[in-house]
Amino acid sequence: MRHRRGCRKAGAKTTKFKPGDSFYAHLNVHNLGGYAQYAVASEVEAASKPKSISFIEAAGVPAVALTAWQALIDTAKLSAGQTVLIHGGSGGVGSFAIQIAKARGAKVIATASTANQDLLKQLGTDVAIDYTKQKFEDIAKDVDVVLDSVGKDTLARSYNVVKKGGFIVTLVARIDQAELDKHDIQGASLRTEPNSSELAEIGKLIDEKKIRVIVSHAFPLSEAIKAQEQVATGHTRGKIVLKVADEPK
């Protein structure tokens, strides 16, 4: 939940940005500071804001889009023609993961509740699974990659649908090495890292209309607690952001 208005002051060694530039950033986990009107970001954490979207929309991109990118592209090495199963496809990470996978030329199977089946299809999902009515393992078989943002029983059942030599990435739990060995697959637990070049690539896809940003609600900074409570429900559609200032004119 970060709203980046732009560069207010640049450090002496800063070469990429100058005061007045518009950028977005994923702050290092050791610094954070996004719940504020002003924050400090290094050049390796920031990239120019996509021109085709608002600042509110831009705030909903860095953390979740980088997570999806680093899970699918950097970690699982997803390539054209492969099949990926994305759990929680209507959420922040999931909605970006679907579109990144499609831009990569992959076939996408995604899970979501009944209310979000329409969104899965709008985002380009090839096979949409309603987890309230269907077991994903009855539909998704021998997939190349699984992206898990749910954990628990969903993760435990996901090992069974990955083909030999495939990859499973979880964002919320530890990978079970015994299960990886049993199914002869690879796996990893992911922690997202700041990456300005990947943010720039994501921004390019957004401006090319290959990625659509979904922001379900923008809370004022004074209602940060309400925003956190909404996130904690685990049923957020797209991204929730904090608005810390009016859009620049």
Task: Give names to the regions the model predicted.
Residues H30-E43:
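A structural motif shared across PLP-dependent enzymes of the aminotransferase-like
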Residues P19, A59-D130:
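Mid-domain Rossmann-like dinucleotide-binding core that forms the NAD(H)/NADP(H) cofactor-binding site
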Residues M1-H30:
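Glycine-rich beta-strand-centered segment in the early N-terminal region that forms part
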Residues Y24, I129, D144-L147, V169:
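N-terminal Rossmann-like NAD(P) cofactor-binding module of classical short-chain dehydrogenase/reductase
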Residues D74-L78, I139, N160:
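Glycine-rich helix-loop-beta junction characteristic of Rossmann-like nucleotide cofactor-binding loops
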Residues Y24-A25, V40, L85, V169:
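Hydrophobic beta-strand signal
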Residues E137-V145:
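A short acidic, Gly/Pro-enriched loop at the edge of an enzyme's catalytic core
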Residues N31, S149-R212, L221, K243-K249:
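Glycine-rich phosphate-binding loop and adjacent beta-alpha segment
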